[in-house]
């Protein structure tokens, strides 16, 4: 049975978000096409996602010195435990669907923090004499991103930092097959917003058949 993580990073629901509407349409279609698969929703705005801070660095330092979990402070234990939960959940899944809005050329900060929970040496990648090697081979991802302007092509494609960063990090940890659905131009062309949304939903439903 394939396990799919539906990872969202939007404080709005599908009623108030073009990206979430497309994401939910994809998941609904995926479930219809693959009823035997397990889909787990991870709402990053309602999930404990520790940022890498002084506590985390201190905990890693203690581990490197040979100390155990019991040597950590309570704050360090809580953060490390939450990070490990996020990491283990991700590692034991087969497919990943990220749904994010673009905020100031990137995605919400919680997505970066989540990726920092995942890129862990010895777990999702390893160092070799030829450089780092990703360990999560054989998995695939989909990124659905909503943007008010057009960023998938043209002069602003170079500043689509969220899309490029997510693809880079996933590739670094071994997830080299990443699909992308752009839900874009709704603010630049408000008269076409509904048309843009419907086209993206149709695209998502079609992709769900082969994802």
UniProtKB/Swiss-Prot annotation:
It comes from the Bacteria. Binds 1 FMN per subunit. FMN binds at residues 102-105. Its EC number is 1.6.5.-, 1.7.1.17. Keywords: Flavoprotein, FMN, NAD, Oxidoreductase. InterPro entries: Flavodoxin_fold (IPR003680), Flavoprotein-like_sf (IPR029039), FMN-dep_NADH:Q_OxRdtase_AzoR1 (IPR050104), NADH:quinone_OxRdtase_FMN_depd (IPR023048). Its cofactor is FMN. Transmembrane segments: none annotated. One of its GO terms (molecular function) is electron transfer activity. It catalyses: 2 a quinone + NADH + H(+) = 2 a 1,4-benzosemiquinone + NAD(+); N,N-dimethyl-1,4-phenylenediamine + anthranilate + 2 NAD(+) = 2-(4-dimethylaminophenyl)diazenylbenzoate + 2 NADH + 2 H(+). Homodimer. Belongs to the azoreductase type 1 family. Quinone reductase that provides resistance to thiol-specific stress caused by electrophilic quinones. This is FMN-dependent NADH:quinone oxidoreductase 2. It comes from Bacillus thuringiensis subsp. konkukian (strain 97-27). The gene is azoR2.
């Amino acid at each position: 049975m394939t396990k799919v993580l539906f990872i969202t990073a939007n404080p709005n629901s599908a009623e108030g978000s073009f990206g979430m509407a497309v994401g939910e349409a994809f998941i609904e279609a995926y479930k219809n096409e693959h009823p035997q698969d397990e889909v787990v929703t991870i709402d990053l705005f309602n999930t404990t996602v520790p940022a890498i801070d002084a506590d985390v660095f201190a905990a890693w330092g203690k581990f490197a010195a040979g100390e155990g979990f019991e040597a950590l402070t309570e704050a360090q234990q809580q953060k490390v435990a939450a990070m490990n939960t996020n990491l283990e959940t991700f590692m034991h899944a087969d497919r990943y669907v990220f749904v994010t809005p673009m905020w100031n050329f990137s995605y919400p900060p919680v997505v970066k923090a989540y990726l920092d929970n995942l890129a862990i040496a010895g777990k999702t990648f390893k160092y070799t004499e030829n450089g780092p090697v990703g360990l999560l081979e054989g998995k695939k991802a989909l990124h659905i991103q909503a943007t008010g302007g057009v960023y998938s092509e043209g002069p602003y494609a170079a500043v689509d930092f969220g899309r490029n960063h997510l693809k880079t990090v996933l590739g670094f940890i071994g997830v080299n097959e990443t699909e992308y659905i752009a839900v874009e131009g709704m603010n630049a062309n408000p008269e076409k917003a509904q048309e843009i949304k419907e086209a993206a939903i149709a695209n998502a439903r079609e992709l769900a058949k082969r994802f």
